[in-house]
Amino acid sequence: MTDQSLSPESGETPTHAGFVAIVGKPNVGKSTLLNAFLNTKVAPTSPRPQTTRRGVRGIYSTDTQQIVFVDTPGLHKPKDALGKYMNQEVQSALADVDAILWVVDLRHPPTEEDELVARQVRDLPKPLFLIGNKVDAAKYPDEAMRLYRALLEGRTGETHERMLSAQNSPQAVAALREQILDALPENPFFFPRSSASDQTREQWAAEIIREEAMKRLREELPYAVATRVTNWTEREDGLQRIEAELIVEKNAHKGMVIGAGGKMLREIGQAARKQLEVFLNCKVFLGLEVIVIPGWREDEEALRELGYE
């Protein structure tokens, strides 16, 4: 993974670079924090838990420092093969990183899922940052932070604490980012300085579409939807033509995603297209199709085909 060509020439200032996992239970603000670190959108966000399904790498670089943030799925008790894959993504990230950000929600005391995260990170000999999020909406943030801190009792590794508001003020995010930069080991850069993510454009666009679907679909249906881009072409006039699929498990789900007269699918497509146009800074044609792959969340072959491997 290391590219020696990204190292400074002999005699130049040495570079520091490392991988930093962002972990926590579902829906505590991990992806929102990652996007704030980078000042751009590389990870999907929605009010629903488990929006993030795979480890998304976001890259922040200065002239001599590089953080590769790994935004992980929320650690939880899995109900299917997809859930097991998501937990494996977390465990794999923790094994390979140089530092850990554990994000907790200060509006609530620790839950069983928080305890599960604490057990994963407590004994790891890596710098750990306990991030108390949503402090502005918490009634008793100091007491909540004390309870989360207690879950790390007995930890001997380097530990830092910081509270953040739900709005992630630029000053607070920058201060935390500087603290993380100080913890990086001396290494050559892992990615070119201009990189913001290791995702392909197709993966990124598919996640934008899935985010908009999750915002609009109800009950358990959002968790039974996957997305993939099947074709992306650019016309001579600059228009980006993107074809994508929304994958569901049942014909009944297909009807719900399409909606009466196609209303739901149009809403998802219009919202996703607007996001894509803002970030791509060009006109986009987005064509969506809903297909059925029965039981895809329990089908390991289907999961691999959808990129969960």
From Swiss-Prot:
InterPro entries the UniProt entry points to: G_ERA_dom, GTP-bd, GTPase_Era-like, KH_dom-like_a/b, KH_dom_type_2, KH_sf_prok-type, P-loop_NTPase, Small_GTP-bd
Domain Era-type G: residue ranges: 16-186
Entry's Gene Ontology BP terms: ribosomal small subunit assembly
Domain KH type-2: 217-294
PROSITE patterns given in the database record: G_ERA, KH_TYPE_2
Region ranges (G5): 164-166
Stretches for region G4: 133-136
Annotated region (G2), positions in chain: 50-54
Keywords: Cell membrane, Cytoplasm, GTP-binding, Membrane, Nucleotide-binding, Ribosome biogenesis, RNA-binding, rRNA-binding
Membrane topology category: Peripheral membrane protein
GO MF term set: GTP binding; GTPase activity; ribosomal small subunit binding; small ribosomal subunit rRNA binding
Compartments in which it is found: Cytoplasm; Cell membrane
Pfam hit, one: MMR_HSR1
Start and end residues of each stretch annotated as G3: 71-74
Chain residues that bind GTP: 24-31, 71-75, 133-136
Gene Ontology CC terms: cytosol; plasma membrane
Chain intervals for the UniProt region annotation (G1): 24-31
NCBIfam families, A to Z: era, PRK00089.1, small_GTP
Similarity annotation: Belongs to the TRAFAC class TrmE-Era-EngA-EngB-Septin-like GTPase superfamily. Era GTPase family.
Function: An essential GTPase that binds both GDP and GTP, with rapid nucleotide exchange. Plays a role in 16S rRNA processing and 30S ribosomal subunit biogenesis and possibly also in cell cycle regulation and energy metabolism.
Known partners and oligomeric status: Monomer.
The protein's name: GTPase Era
Gene name as annotated: era
